[in-house]
Regions:
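Substrate-binding clefts and catalytic carboxylate motifs of secreted carbohydrate-active enzymes
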Residues: 4-5, 11-15, 75, 123-124, ...
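Short, hydrophobic beta-strand segments
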Residues: 102, 206-216, 665-671, 764-783
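Extended acidic/polar, glycine-enriched regions
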Residues: 107-109, 169-252, 670-673, 682, ...
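Short flexible loop/turn segments that cap and initiate beta-strands
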Residues: 179-184, 219-225, 631-633, 639-641, ...
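Short aromatic-acidic-glycine turn motif
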Residues: 189-196, 655, 700, 742-758, ...
């Protein structure tokens, strides 16, 4: 078998134009569209339109006979694959892997034209930024007539102690009459553990005994190298290489979740699939970076909201140690937007679930499958029956992993009364399309009542979920699941221990600012196994639902053009942790150091419009050039008993912190260009301190890369922070300064932008503006060895450069997933 990455050297065009551009995959076509206040997608996609696109590539087929197919990890959406003008396959859904067999259509030993037609023109079809085009990898598979099916290797750890027992099922396409054998070997240093079996119709089943077993967990992500070979008469017909961790899962209401028999609580982050300024394009290095930052900040689990997670992210979670709840869809058979996947649910749900499970089932990080999110029809008899069929289908593919679904009990209750709460959001989108194309339309909408309502939305949803009617509208669905997924329903956690004593609960979606109370319940109640905040990482689309505005700026739930970023992320789209992250780290006891945050001194705080999914607008900075003499509101996050805050050595007082104060101490003082120091104490003893400094001396640009060496494979990317700093290296809170980035040598500029929630420029341009002193550039390596010179320039603050190296020698970024 030859398995070749097929990402490089494509041509791409909008279907409505003749002009073509050379592109390498992954590629997000939506990111190249012009955002507009009149976009039919509205705030869902951050005011990006969809479109129709054509990708094409000329490929010289080998002269040798054999099975040839193309394997697509993700195309958004309604794709058709053509070979020499003849249709070979495709996929309706935008998040489903699929294979297109092409050997019967190619001319052997000659050039062949591969085309992929993509139609994302029906709008709206998503509640968030979807991207468009071939946004994940494409593989060329050249195989014999006897082959291991894609996703056809299924490993399950049956017993785990000093030795481990692993069951292996290998699914085979056996088109010949030969006597075919399967051999599976697992190795972690030393000699491999292996087993061999003859292939029966459909495949083979084997049992492998692994001595001196080293288990996989998020705390200790040990991975074995696995080789699966298909042989006949000593000839290797096909093989797959993968990595696998020995891991068992048990869950019940009395003992909670156990991984390898060890009690485990899930510190979870809901994440969308987009990569911030890279749009929907999935780059392996970007997924590893995101997983690494999430792990460093204290998360041990992610929920893929609300579509199957990428293979690259799965590899990252396996390697770095993150548990995964992989989710299949946001819709079943009732639409949430006019043209979404509900319209073809009946014909696609089985294939979509199967693709997800077959992708996931060799990954030890995957500890839960979710069959949907906020499916209001799950409160109906028809929906419960659909759930029953879906759970059975998942179990037929992998019975070793529990199944859940994110259920919003308030929505179920409303649906039972004939109300569709998603319809109101569509009306708001239509209303927002009247906004101007300059900056958010200003109107006198702010009021004490509005801010009170928005700040209490999470509590209102939880209280609604606690009503008997919500229980009645949801219990049938929960009876079908292994784990009941509660969206915004923490008010039920304690009472449902009595009402439903056998029910295991996970907080599939929660407000980040509820983490203190939620986590106390997770630690106390064995039937509640974790909490997944919305969101761990910020995302594009659902524009402005977590963004605070000021003065006469729009206070609507979803914000008008040009808002693009959602805003609720504990970590922003560039990878910088914010106040919600500091709160969670304090609650989880991840650090003894207090975290200082300051409400923005570059905005008018007298008229503040809160956002439903964000409890604070505070920023981790004391470098505000426009703040001199203004009143500063300071938040210090800590799990200590108390916090003292000092300004230039002068005490501003001592405040309670820790659980009694919601893990935050609040101070007020006049801003001055000095140094803030927070000191955390437990029983009077200092346990940690932190500092924020004001700006000192002249300002200049600084550019920093997350890596110095890139693989020269056309796929590796480096993330470069471009910052406005003072002479001491402190990032200064200035926004709006124009910035240009140039890339010379063996790399290209792939993305440039910032965490600005309402940018006017494009992430595909070489120019952007600083947002609170920062921007992010992403550089992609070419296939050439050499050097990449990246330079950032500002008219006012000069320039800064860094030189990176591209090398073919490294194998750390190798794409090995099966």
């Amino acid at each position: 078998m030859t398995r070749t990455l097929f990402d490089l050297g494509w041509e791409w065009r909008n279907a409505d134009t003749a002009a073509r551009q050379l592109v390498d995959l992954p590629h997000d076509a939506m990111l190249h569209e012009q955002r507009s206040a009149s976009s039919a997608n509205g705030s869902h996609t951050g005011w990006f339109p969809g479109g129709r696109y054509v990708y094409r590539k000329t490929w010289r087929a080998p002269a040798d006979p054999g099975r040839v197919s193309l394997f697509f990890e993700g195309v958004y959406r309604k794709s058709r694959v053509l070979v020499n003008g003849v249709e070979a396959g495709g996929c309706l859904g935008g998040y489903t892997e699929f294979e297109a067999r092409i050997d019967h259509l190619i001319e052997r030993g000659s050039n062949n034209l591969i085309e992929v037609h993509v139609d994302n023109s029906e709008e709206p079809n998503s509640r968030w930024y979807s991207g468009s085009g071939i946004y994940r990898h494409v593989w060329l598979l050249e195989q014999s007539s006897d082959r291991i099916k894609p996703g056809g290797v299924h490993l399950v750890t049956r017993a785990l102690g000093g030795t481990a027992s692993v069951s292996a099922r290998v699914e085979v396409d056996n088109d010949s009459s030969r006597d075919v054998q399967v051999r599976v070997s697992m190795q972690l240093g030393g000699s491999p553990a292996e087993a061999t079996a003859s292939v029966a119709p459909g495949g083979a089943e084997l049992e492998i005994t692994v001595p001196d077993a080293q288990p996989w967990s998020a705390e200790s992500p040990v991975l074995y190298d696995v080789l699966v070979e298909l042989t006949a008469d000593g000839e290797v017909l096909d093989q797959q290489e993968l990595r696998y961790g020995l891991r068992t899962i048990d869950v019940d209401a009395s003992r909670g979740l156990r991984i390898n028999s060890q009690p485990t609580l899930l510190r979870g982050a809901c994440i969308h699939h987009d990569s911030g300024i890279l749009g929907g394009a999935t780059f392996r290095a970007a997924e590893f970076r995101r997983a690494r930052i999430l792990r460093e900040q204290g998360f041990n689990a992610v929920r893929s909201s609300h579509n199957p997670i990428s293979r690259d992210m799965l590899d990252a979670c396996d390697e770095l140690g993150l548990y995964v709840m992989d989710e299949s869809s946001d819709v079943w058979f009732r639409t949430k937007t006019a043209h979404d996947a509900a319209l073809h649910f009946d014909e696609t749900w089985e294939a979509e679930l199967e693709a997800m499970v077959r992708k996931d089932r060799t990954h030890p990080s995957v500890i839960m499958y979710s069959i949907g999110n906020e499916i209001a029809e799950s409160g109906t008899a028809e929906g419960i029956e659909a759930a029953r069929r879906m759970v059975a289908h998942v179990k037929s593919l992998d019975a070793s992993v529990p199944v859940t679904c994110g259920v919003n009990l308030m929505l179920n209750m409303a649906a039972a009364r004939g109300k569709n709460l998603f319809a109101g959001h569509e009306k708001q989108n239509a209303k927002n399309q009247d906004a101007t194309a300059a900056r958010p339309k200003r109107k006198a909408l702010t009021s004490t009542g509005y801010n009170f309502l928005v700040s209490k939305l999470g509590s209102l949803m939880a209280r609604a979920a606690a009503l008997p009617a919500a229980d009645k509208a949801s219990r049938g669905m929960f009876d079908v699941l292994d784990v009941a997924g509660y969206n915004y329903a923490h008010a039920r956690y304690r009472k449902d221990r009595t009402l439903h004593p056998g029910r295991v609960i996970v907080g599939t979606e929660t407000m980040p600012f509820h983490i203190a109370g939620n986590w106390a319940l997770v630690e106390e109640l064995p039937h509640v196994i974790g909490d997944f905040m919305w969101t761990g990482w910020d995302y594009l689309g659902e524009a402005g639902i977590g963004t605070w505005t000021y003065g006469d700026e729009s206070a609507s739930f979803a914000k008008p053009y040009p808002y693009l970023v959602a805003g609720p992320g504990a970590i922003d789209i560039t990878g910088n942790p914010g106040a919600p992250m500091a709160l969670a780290r304090a609650v989880w006891g991840q650090t003894d150091e207090p975290a200082i945050f300051v409400r923005p001194l570059d905005r008018d705080l007298k008229r503040t419009n809160r956002a439903a999914w964000r409890a604070t607008d505070a920023v981790a900075s004391w470098a505000w050039p426009e703040g001199e003499g203004r009143r500063a509101e300071i938040e210090v996050y800590s799990n200590a008993d108390e916090v003292e805050l000092r300004l230039d050595g002068r005490s501003l007082g001592v405040r309670r912190a820790g659980r009694r104060a919601g893990f935050v101490a609040r101070f007020r003082t006049a801003y001055s260009s000095e140094t803030l120091v927070a000191i955390a104490r437990v029983q009077g003893r200092e346990v940690g301190r932190s500092t924020l400094a004001s700006a000192v001396g002249p300002l200049a640009l600084r550019i920093r890369s997350d890596k110095g060496v890139l693989d020269a494979d056309g796929q590796d990317v480096a993330h470069l922070a471009v910052e406005l700093v003072d002479s001491a290296g402190t990032v200064v809170m200035l926004s709006g300064e124009g910035l240009e980035v140039s890339v010379d040598g063996t790399g290209t500029l792939t993305g440039l932008g910032s965490a600005d929630p309402a940018p006017l420029g494009s992430y595909t341009d070489a120019r952007t503006e600083l947002f609170r002193g920062s921007a992010l550039a992403v550089v992609r390596a070419t296939t050439e060895q050499g050097e990449v010179r990246v330079t950032a320039r500002s008219r006012v603050y000069g320039e800064s450069s860094v030189t990176l190296t591209t090398s073919i020698a490294s194998t750390t970024g190798e794409l090995i997933h099966a």
